[in-house]
């Protein structure tokens, strides 16, 4: 079972498809005028399913700031999760997808032939809607990606695992039970374990796709508190269906509607002084 998980993990971290990223297109490797206060700059991005027959994103242009929490809001099917997956090329796990445009991460074009998918997925970690602990011990869950990178030294592993679990506000709850199976943890603990597993690789960015949607209010509160602490070290980009959550935790908010960015800016401005009618209608519950 462990070997099978390792093979799947390696495939997940490094896999690409020939059609999805359209790497035959000539792209600029670097963006010379990249703003150092940003972590991502996205330019003229369009994304398609079904070999171009179904367009999911339209002409997306967006700058995402470093060490901020940026929330993506909008109705179901508006493109926010699709866009999130593009930021670490997870879209390439889906067949028959294609896109045009550019995504720059720390000046580099992530779809350039020179950019390593493995390096990107280490630097831009992902936490999914449903907690995904591996069926192994708590310790081995956090150690898994480290060992996959070739780290075998027990002292380094122990130190990194403790640091990661502390950063995920989980250490005090599990420090005496590190050999227990991870799937026996509560839902909220499992999600924090997945966050610990992601930050063990020392990423710059954490992508979170509705990380609290399956959790109770108490577990949700703990995750939100954790996000506020983590933004001191990481850039966090979160998809949420909860406008209240976006207001509580995010510095910047991006409103998607029918595959387009309608409005983005400081969260207070989006919710208190929206410029666009569609934004006002969504926030006030008139569209959804």
Swiss-Prot record:
Any one of the GO BP annotations: phosphate ion transmembrane transport
Keywords: ATP-binding, Cell membrane, Membrane, Nucleotide-binding, Phosphate transport, Translocase, Transport
GO molecular function: ATP binding; ATP hydrolysis activity; ATPase-coupled phosphate ion transmembrane transporter activity
Domain called ABC transporter: residue spans: 42-283
Binding sites annotated in the UniProt record for ATP: 74-81
A GO term from the CC aspect: plasma membrane
UniProt membrane topology term: Peripheral membrane protein
Localization, UniProt: Cell membrane
Keyword Translocase set for record: yes
Catalysed reactions listed for this entry: phosphate(out) + ATP + H2O = ADP + 2 phosphate(in) + H(+)
Listed EC numbers: 7.3.2.1
Enzyme class, broadest EC rank: translocase
InterPro entries registered for this protein in UniProt: AAA+_ATPase (IPR003593), ABC_transporter-like_ATP-bd (IPR003439), ABC_transporter-like_CS (IPR017871), P-loop_NTPase (IPR027417), PstB-like (IPR005670)
Subunit comment: The complex is composed of two ATP-binding proteins (PstB), two transmembrane proteins (PstC and PstA) and a solute-binding protein (PstS).
Function: Part of the ABC transporter complex PstSACB involved in phosphate import. Responsible for energy coupling to the transport system.
UniProt family annotation: Belongs to the ABC transporter superfamily. Phosphate importer (TC 3.A.1.7) family.
PANTHER family: ABC TRANSPORTER I FAMILY MEMBER 17
Protein name: Phosphate import ATP-binding protein PstB
Originating species: Malacoplasma penetrans (strain HF-2) (Mycoplasma penetrans)
């Amino acid at each position: 079972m462990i070997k099978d998980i390792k093979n799947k993990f390696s495939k997940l971290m490094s896999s690409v498809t020939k059609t999805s990223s359209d790497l035959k297109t000539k792209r600029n490797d670097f963006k010379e005028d990249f703003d150092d206060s940003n972590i991502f700059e996205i330019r003229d991005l369009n994304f398609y399913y079904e070999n171009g027959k179904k367009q999911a994103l339209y002409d997306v242009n967006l700058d995402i700031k470093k060490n901020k929490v940026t929330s993506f809001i909008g109705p179901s099917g508006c493109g926010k999760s699709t866009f999130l997956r593009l930021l670490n090329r997870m879209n390439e796990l889906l067949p028959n997808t294609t896109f045009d445009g550019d995504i720059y991460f720390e000046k580099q074009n992530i779809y350039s032939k020179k950019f390593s998918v493995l390096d990107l997925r280490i630097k831009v970690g992902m936490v999914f809607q449903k907690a995904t602990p591996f069926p192994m011990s708590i310790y081995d869950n956090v150690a898994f990606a480290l060992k996959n990178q070739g780290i075998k030294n027990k002292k380094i592993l122990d130190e990194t695992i403790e640091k990661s679990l502390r950063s995920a506000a989980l250490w005090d709850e599990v420090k005496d039970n590190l050999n227990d199976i991870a799937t026996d943890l509560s839902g909220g603990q499992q999600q924090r374990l997945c966050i610990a597993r992601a930050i063990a690789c020392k990423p710059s960015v954490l992508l979170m796709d509705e990380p609290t949607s399956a959790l109770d209010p108490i577990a949700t509160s703990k995750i939100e508190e954790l996000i506020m602490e983590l933004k001191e070290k990481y850039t966090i980009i979160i998809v949420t269906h909860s406008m209240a959550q976006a207001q509580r935790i995010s510095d910047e908010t991006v409103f998607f509607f029918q595959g387009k960015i309608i409005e983005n800016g400081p969260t207070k401005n989006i919710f208190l002084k929206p410029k666009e009618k569609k934004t006002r209608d969504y926030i006030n519950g008139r569209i959804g």
